[in-house]
């Protein structure tokens, strides 16, 4: 797990909320505090659909327009937390050249990204959850490095905190 302090908040938020750089991820949870608190869970409500959806998880690209609409205006949110889970496609994109991609495919841990904005500071935090206990940290270290490299490839200034 690493924490990346983002120095270019506006640019980072554009990549998160406007561009498609994280669209392949699944939403775990989002909380935004403006004049009132908005909370969004990443589980799909099957009763809302006429036909059962193929996936019970919600992709970030489905939720971000709602979040963006909620926060746009003259005032920035007091607080915002967005937790994403990497999809298989996103994990492949970031880990395919890491040397641990085959191990990732065997173990299939949950790879997480959390974006936290509070008190005019934005941080990205990586995370990983294994189905079984392991002392092997290779996937975790590769995920941390891949996320840091990905953020830098987007042209966003970040430093480990």
Walk through the language-model features, giving the residues of each:
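Generic structural motif
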Residues: 9, 38, 43, 85-91, ...
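Mixed-charge, glycine-accented linear interaction segment located at domain edges/termini
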Residues: 122-161
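Surface-exposed, low-hydrophobicity interaction/linker segments
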Residues: 55-121
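Short, surface-exposed, charged/polar-biased interaction segments
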Residues: 30, 34, 39, 43, ...
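Charge-rich, low-complexity N-terminal segments
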Residues: 1-62
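Generic "edge-of-domain/loop-turn" microfeature
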Residues: 23, 27, 31-32, 89-91, ...
């Amino acid at each position: 797990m690493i924490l990346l302090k983002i120095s270019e908040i506006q640019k980072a938020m554009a990549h998160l909320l406007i561009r498609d750089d994280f669209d392949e991820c699944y939403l775990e949870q989002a909380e935004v505090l403006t004049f009132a608190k908005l909370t969004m869970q990443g589980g799909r409500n099957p009763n809302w659909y006429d036909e059962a959806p193929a996936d019970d998880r919600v992709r970030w690209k489905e939720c971000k327009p709602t979040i963006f609409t909620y926060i746009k205006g003259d005032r920035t949110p007091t607080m915002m937390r967005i937790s994403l889970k990497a999809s298989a496609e996103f994990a492949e994109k970031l880990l395919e050249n890491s040397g641990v991609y085959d191990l990732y495919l065997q173990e299939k841990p949950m790879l997480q990204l959390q974006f936290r904005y509070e008190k005019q500071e934005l941080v990205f935090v990586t995370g990983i959850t294994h189905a079984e206990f392991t002392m092997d940290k290779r996937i975790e270290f590769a995920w941390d490095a891949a996320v840091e490299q990905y953020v830098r490839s987007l042209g966003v200034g970040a430093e480990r905190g």
